[in-house]
Swiss-Prot record:
It catalyses: 4 Fe(II)-[cytochrome c] + O2 + 8 H(+)(in) = 4 Fe(III)-[cytochrome c] + 2 H2O + 4 H(+)(out). It comes from Yarrowia lipolytica (strain CLIB 122 / E 150). One of its GO terms (cellular component) is mitochondrial inner membrane. This is Cytochrome c oxidase subunit 3. It is a multi-pass membrane protein.
Amino acid sequence: MNLTLKKFQVHPFHLVAPSPWPILVSFSVMSIMLTLVFNMHGFMHNNYWVVFSAIVAIMTMALWFRDIISEATYLGDHTLAVRKGLNIGFILFVVSELFFFIAIFWAFFHSAMAPTIELGGVWPPVGIEAIGPSELPLLNTILLLCSGATLTWSHHALLGGNRFNTLLGLILTIALAVTFMICQYMEYSNAPFTISDGIFGSVFYFGTGFHGLHIIIGIIMLGVSLWRIYTYQLTNNHHVGYETSILYYHFVDVVWLFLYIVFYWWGT
């Protein structure tokens, strides 16, 4: 805790100063969704505004993260009580994400377990050639499981004070996650159906695409953690950002296992 806080503050909590970043991030994310919907429905004939909104969102989030890192690393605002609150808040965030994916699985099971006459009374629907569980989906599963293992290795190395293994494990994790996204892109490019092909295509692409978005976010979070470990900002007893990144990535790993079993194996 810095000298100013010790002199004037009698509680361990961080009183956040006014910041422009939350409202700017909110508006930029809203702009992404609106321009994306308008583009999908033909009201916009290019992706320029979608890309612009995404760039603004990334820039404002980066500036917001910069302020948080400064508060945690240099200003001493993240006391034990604050770190406990951050961990609890992030766990609640992961729970909210869990319910989001539950809704996606619910939509899939609702249609798959009682296919209507419009679908031909079968699942997958008539005319849909589903993607099987072998080849790319199986490779993606192996990649994510390996990345989860290397991430756990990196975390244990950090706890043990082994800086080299910490960085190596984190680099391997990011490389495996990027490879997963490349394979996912290849799968989408060669898929025999699109997001417009009825409920099967809609739920499949929404579920796997939303998971892919979480992988991208996880890569960014792990990349920031890699930079902070490399610059000696995180230690073996103070690395809340890295711990939350690990929790997030393992959650995404588990979600993929359910996606693989339900969408690629049982659902086909």
